[in-house]
Swiss-Prot record:
The keyword Secreted does not apply. The gene is ileS. This is Isoleucine--tRNA ligase. InterPro entries: aa-tRNA-synth_I_CS, aa-tRNA-synth_Ia, Anticodon_Ile_BEm, Ile-tRNA-ligase, Ile-tRNA-ligase_type1, Ile-tRNA_ligase, M/V/L/I-tRNA-synth_anticd-bd, Rossmann-like_a/b/a_fold. One of its GO terms (cellular component) is cytosol. Catalyzes the attachment of isoleucine to tRNA(Ile). As IleRS can inadvertently accommodate and process structurally similar amino acids such as valine, to avoid such errors it has two additional distinct tRNA(Ile)-dependent editing activities. One activity is designated as 'pretransfer' editing and involves the hydrolysis of activated Val-AMP. The other activity is designated 'posttransfer' editing and involves deacylation of mischarged Val-tRNA(Ile). CDD domains: Anticodon_Ia_Ile_BEm. Its cofactor is Zn(2+). It is found in: Cytoplasm. The keyword Methyltransferase does not apply. Binds 1 zinc ion per subunit. ATP binds at K621. Monomer.
């Protein structure tokens, strides 16, 4: 009767659960972190280390967090935690952006506009309360993601101290000569009733009217002479302009052409039986004439654009307004006619041209910009014939103006155009350029542009294309409009002269005094302040301005209001945000940093892409393809979300779907199962008692420690360059290939069948201890909850949390004089692969069942055979086969053959051995198992 030898085996045993059950287990871990003040402990353990400062860009305090928020915060958290393991003190101070329009809109919906049911002070208080509520909700969700930080003392742009520091930052900028006031065209949203920053604009497709309008020459013969042509007496001469904004024509004050472009004088369409010659850019003439119904290009002359400068034209519908022709380098021959109508109140380039020609002072504010803040023509706007423009909204005026142009005979062509057009990011409505008195940070007055361009080159950009992108933006951006005509924000505390409009000569000093008061009483003090307290006898000569600061200025000065205020160094080591922040926070921070300190406030900038579905479509409720982070956490756990983020190339768009989440869960399961198997085989192992020195380890165990050392070097380098996808892939490959398909499979025999205290078994356990101690650190920044759980099962004495340690120092490379070198193992593993390939058809054809039923013969070159023959007795354990024979052969490589064994199977280790049945007490066991059960135990050297 056969005996049950199972009790003589040392099978894996661990309480570490097979199932992660993350939605239930993570909250308990989070509760413990809260109870133990994990962040404070982390900082205490890191005290005295070099500082690594990742400065948090503030999310807006409005609404639930979405997947983009989760991506951003988790990437930051991975970096912070990896830096702690790398030997740094890496504080993380989260922040919130609290002022601005979205909160105003939320309060207006609930209470009405300012001055209706609430005065401005009450309105701001409601905004403050609303922001505080939103922060609480978002903070809860961020913490649930496993984000570790100073959640009890975050920075908030609504804090009195922050608002005061923001005013002090503005005072510095005033001191440096960067602040100017001017009437310039700025992005304007009629729904907001305010100017918009570049970062508050998004481009969406829009259908616009597209018209070609003729501007008749007032001295046609002189203009024709420029083209060396003689104008017949019965022929009109005009320059057609092409525009998609007919509503701007009442503000049209000039025509611009390109000075170096080639223009031709061509035969145009007749009007009321009268011939008409037109001036068109040569490159666009045929296409333009086709729009006018003319197939043949008949040229009467040619000239450069510069030759037409200062010729005078009639306005298409205001007969008493003369239109000069000016030169503008912004005019191109890409589309249209090569001539653009110029409305300096509604276009930045138009405004610049008028500035260059010194023409701005010739016109009233209403002539430059006849449109009010709501998008309605002013009462002073002249009618267009019988069409009254005053009081008419510009979008309604567009088709009426086109009809009026047609009646007057100056409309050459009209159609509709589908194009990308700027919209307000909040209201999703089209915006315009509108000249209004605003406060600007000048890009030129104190050489801010050139200094910012230089500073960009001293920053490391991830990905590298980020540098070229922001360089292009800074090169081409206009002055920064920092004033807003809203209620909820930090005031621009300037006193301006009642008559000249000039700021008080001691503005910066006054602003600092006001900042001191704001720090104690908040921004309301500015509006209630009796200015005689600060200005004394000058008070009657000055008035306060009521504009507030752009919210991008709020977040743009956090390097001053947060880092300096908390004693942290500038510049920060890293800013990390979405790719849209090249024109947002990265840029506003850069400009304020350079304006104040002549340096960028960051050493490195890293950007991540946006989340899309598996088809590359933006996630949205309307498409029904959105996946919320809260749903992932409830069903799968935060670590699954964290693993997806880490495993994705975040430099591009990040695809997510249920199928991708399933694959991520499978990857997580592989990591968890590997950790569980390692822990299971550490049952009964105490590193203080049983750890085997590296030099005494079995060769295979020593090699896997060497492989782990190599991987740790790779992983550390990848964390340093923020390549988390490489880390995940490296870990998964290690789990599947080095461990799953090789090391763990091979060492099962030793771990299960040897005596508990056998040196060969303790050697394998030592290797697995080293692997687990390193492995838990590798995954800790990414799988924070799982690493915390795994760490608690690691045998031996250690710190309370894996993040209180640094990278594992128990790994080491194989020395060059090792009995089996890394090169030897490369060859042996290649041989092992060949053995597997030889056995596959034998298994498929039923010659053998398991590989243990095969006996292997390896014929190799003499020197290779001589190297491998000492290993012969143990090669069967590496191959997990029956006996292995190595013979020398006349070959450069090696040849593998196999045959089915005729030997009996051991009932305990399942190996097929010739000595089974030789022992009377254990007739079913091989000699090796007998010595492991009843004797001193087997000896192993190699595998």
């Amino acid at each position: 009767m056969s005996q049950d030898y199972k009790t003589t085996l040392h099978l894996p045993a661990t309480d570490f659960p097979m199932r992660g059950d993350l939605p239930k287990r993570e909250p308990a871990i989070l509760e413990r972190w809260e109870r133990d003040d994990f962040y404070a402990q982390l900082r205490a353990h890191a005290k005295g280390r070099p500082l690594f400062l990742l400065h948090d860009g503030p999310p807006y305090a409005n609404g639930q967090i979405h997947l983009g928020h989760a991506v951003n915060k988790i990437l930051k958290d991975i970096i912070i935690k990896s830096k702690h393991l790398d030997g740094f003190d890496a504080p993380y101070i989260p922040g919130w952006d609290c002022h601005g329009l979205p909160i105003e809109i939320a309060i207006e919906k609930k209470y009405g506009k300012v001055g209706v049911t609430l005065d401005a002070v009450q309105f701001r208080q409601k905004c403050r309360e609303y922001a505080a509520e939103q922060i609480q909700l978002q903070r809860r969700d961020f913490k649930r993601l496993g984000i570790i930080g100073d959640w009890d003392a975050p920075y908030k742009t609504l804090d009195f101290r922050f608002e005061a520091d923001e005013i002090r930052a503005l005072a510095k900028i005033v001191d440096k000569g960067h602040l100017i006031r001017g009437t310039k065209p700025v992005h304007w949203c009629f729904d907001c009733g305010s100017a918009l920053a570049e970062a508050e604009i998004e481009y969406t497709d829009k259908i616009s009217p597209m018209v070609d309008v003729a501007y008749p020459a007032l001295d046609p013969s002189a203009l024709a002479a420029v083209f060396n042509a003689t104008l017949p007496p019965d022929v009109q001469l005009a320059v057609p302009i092409w525009t998609t904004t007919p509503w701007t024509l009442p503000a049209s004050l000039a025509i611009c052409v390109g000075p170096t472009l080639d223009y031709v004088l061509v035969e145009g369409p007749t009007h009321s039986g009268q011939r008409r010659w037109l001036i068109l850019a040569e490159a666009l003439a045929a296409k333009a004439l086709a729009r006018y119904g003319i197939a043949e290009l008949l040229i009467h002359g040619s000239a450069k654009g510069a030759a037409m400068e200062q010729h005078i034209f009639a306005h298409p519908f205001y007969p008493d307004r003369t239109i000069p022709l000016l030169l503008g380098n912004h005019v191109s021959a890409e589309d249209g006619t090569g001539a653009v109508h110029t409305a300096p109140g509604h276009g930045q380039e138009d405004h610049q041209v008028f500035q260059q020609y010194g023409l701005l002072n010739r016109y009233s504010a209403a002539e430059l910009n006849p449109v009010d803040a709501r998008g309605v023509y002013l009462s002073t706007t002249p009618p267009l014939g019988e069409l009254t423009l005053a009081g008419l909204h510009i979008w309604k005026a567009n088709p009426l103006i086109v009809d009026a142009l047609r009646l007057r005979g100056v409309l050459l062509a009209a159609a509709e155009m589908h194009h990308s057009y700027p919209h307000c990011w909040r209201h999703k409505t089209p915006i315009v350029f509108r000249a209004t008195p605003q406060w600007f940070i000048s890009m030129e007055q104190a050489a801010l542009r050139s200094a910012a361009l230089k500073a960009i080159t001293h920053v490391t950009w991830y990905p590298q294309w980020g540098q070229a992108r922001i360089l292009s933006m800074i090169e081409n951006r206009p002055d920064w409009t920092i004033s807003r005509q809203r209620t909820w924000g930090v005031p621009i505390p300037l006193f301006v002269h009642r008559h000249s409009g000039a700021p008080h000569p001691h503005s910066a000093a006054l602003m600092r005094q006001i900042a001191d008061r704001v720090q104690q009483q908040g921004v309301d003090i500015w509006y209630s302040l009796d200015q005689t307290e600060l200005l004394g006898t000058e008070a009657d000569q000055y008035e306060k301005i009521t504009d507030i600061l752009d919210v991008w200025f709020d977040s743009g000065i956090t390097h001053e209001a947060v880092l300096l205020e908390r004693g942290l160094p500038k510049p920060a080591d890293l800013y990390l945000e979405g790719a849209d922040q090249h024109r947002g926070w990265f840029q506003s921070s850069l400009l304020t940093g350079v304006a104040m300190d002549n340096a960028a406030p960051y050493k490195q900038c890293l950007t991540h892409g946006f989340t899309v579905d598996q088809h590359g479509r933006k996630m949205s409720k309307s498409l029904g393809n959105g996946i919320e982070p809260q749903d992932i956490i409830k069903t799968l756990g935060a670590d699954i979300l964290r693993l997806w983020i880490a495993s994705t190339d975040y430099s591009n768009e990040m695809s997510l779907s249920q199928e991708i989440l399933k694959r991520t869960t499978d990857a997580y399961r592989r990591i968890r199962n590997t950790a569980r198997f390692l822990l299971g085989n550490l049952h009964g192992f105490d590193p203080t008692l049983h750890l085997v020195p590296l030099s005494d380890m079995i060769a295979l165990d020593r090699w896997i420690v060497h492989r782990a050392f190599e991987l740790q070097q790779t992983i550390k380098a990848a964390y340093t360059r923020y390549d988390f996808a490489e880390i995940v892939q490296t870990i998964l490959n290690f789990c599947s290939v080095d461990l799953g398909s090789l090391y763990l499979d091979v060492t099962k025999d030793r771990l299960y069948t040897m005596r508990e205290d056998a040196p060969g078994r303790r050697s394998a356990q030592t290797a697995m201890y080293h692997l687990t101690a390193a492995f838990v650190r590798w995954i800790a920044p990414i799988l924070s909850f799982t690493a915390d759980e795994l760490w608690s099962y690691l045998p031996g004495d250690h710190a309370d949390n894996v993040l209180f340690t640094t990278w594992y120092d128990g790994l080491a490379p194989l020395p060059p004089n090792a009995p089996l070198t890394a090169a030897d193992f490369d060859k042996l593993l290649t041989l092992r692969d060949h053995v597997t390939k030889v056995l596959e058809p034998m298994r498929a054809n039923g010659v053998i069942g398991a590989a243990l039923e095969a006996e292997i013969t390896v014929a190799a070159a003499a020197d290779t055979a001589a190297r491998w023959q000492p290993l012969t007795e143990e090669l069967r354990f590496l191959f997990i086969t029956g006996d292995v024979t190595v013979t020398p052969a006349n070959t450069d490589g090696f040849f593998v053959s196999a045959q089915a064994t005729t030997k009996a199977k051991c009932a305990r280790c399942w190996h097929y051995r010739a000595d089974i049945g030789a022992h009377p007490t254990h007739p079913e066991l091989c000699g090796r198992c007998i010595t492991n059960v009843d004797g001193p135990g087997e000896q192993r050297h190699w595998f």
